[in-house]
Structures are given as C-alpha cells and as structure tokens.
C-alpha cells in the first residue's frame, strides 16, 4: 500500500470513527466514510493489547498486504481498520477472509 493512500492525521481518524458507520468481525472492525475527493485512503489502528511493538508492526504489515490484495482504491471511501487482540490468534488466511467479508459488506471489493 503506497503512502499516498494512508490516513495519518489524528483528526481524520476521529472524524471517520465519529460517523459510526462500521462493520465488525471477530478479529477486526472496519470504519467507513464516503468521500467526494480524490482517491480512497486507509488507516490502520493496532492497540497495545495486541502485543509489543514488534508484534504490532508485524500485524500492520500483514494488514497492508491484505489491503493491497482486497481493497479497490478506485472507490471514494476512507476506511480505518481497527485490529482486535484476537487477530494474532488466527491464521493469515482466516484474517484475510474476515477483511474480505467486511469490505464486501461495504461493497469496496476488487
């Protein structure tokens, strides 16, 4: 996932999460906001309950890989992927299926 497609500012995270349009699964929560500008962007949030810094960074790398395979950047959506602590207990393929099903509910799927 290229850096231009990432959400980085705290106020942008807050704005998207305040809209309260979300889809959840056992390992992650997907917050969505329709936007009328340029391209889609994605933000990833991993809490400290997931593990130490190394574990959290590994999870972020995995999510970025999954998003590249699953997410269509042609749609005009800002999304935030919030990772739950159960994410590390599941296999990569299972987590990818949960992410795909969340994006299918939003209808932003490749």
What do these predicted ranges mean?
Residues 1-110:
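Positively charged, solvent-exposed patches that mediate nucleic-acid binding
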